[in-house]
């Protein structure tokens, strides 16, 4: 399992002249957040680049676009979220990565201690079914061999140059479709995972999001979308794709015929 995008190393940005009453730690957190989730050309990293990246983030999260660090921005930056960037090359659906085979295999290679294995198996299958019932694509679980999608839990550094950061922060990350590591999804075992009925991170919600990436979807700025990058508590019983999610996945794969919907 590896990260979808490896960001280039770069020197820290100089702090903007107007600190706005925010602490140095908040400014550093903002710099790291923007570098990770709104990456820009390493050659242009300066105070002006900070403002441009901040405006991009504010626009994505539908905040007032000021280019200034404020309390609303800080609140968003402190929310648990997916580890993938919110930006990327805007390609037409015909040129975006997707699975060609109509049957995609997956394998769960490691589990969390927070939930019974049978519960994890069930929730992964449920998350995949949410997507497959809308498109002409089926998923088959395998227990041996090399699957299309590898799913697992890990802590800290786990061999992909993209370490998890402990409780909170980034919850999971995944690959877009492709050979080798393409499609892989993994989850931070330092989180407290739940099935939606108790305290903790709703695994179904996060798995549905990450497996959306495994199918080729990007982050959405619609708060109702399962592809929204930050995590919010959701009811597992009523959890479902938004109309925008369905539209996006069908643009990639087409519609599943009504007779084949599960």
UniProtKB/Swiss-Prot annotation:
Keyword Transmembrane helix (UniProt): no
Q: At which positions is motif Cysteine switch?
A: 80-87
Q: Could you name the domain of life of the organism this protein comes from?
A: Eukaryota
Q: What is its EC number?
A: 3.4.24.23
Indicate the residues that form the catalytic site.
Answer: 210
Q: Which residues are processed away as propeptide to yield the mature protein?
A: 13-89
Co-factor binding details: Binds 2 calcium ions per subunit. Binds 2 Zn(2+) ions per subunit.
Question: From which residue to which does the signal peptide run?
Answer: 1-12
Subcellular locations according to the entry: Secreted, Extracellular space, Extracellular matrix
Fetch the SMART domains from UniProt: ZnMc
Q: What is known of its domains?
A: The conserved cysteine present in the cysteine-switch motif binds the catalytic zinc ion, thus inhibiting the enzyme. The dissociation of the cysteine from the zinc ion upon the activation-peptide release activates the enzyme.
* Name used for this protein in its record: Matrilysin
> What is the species of this protein?
Felis catus (Cat)
Q: By which gene is this protein encoded?
A: MMP7
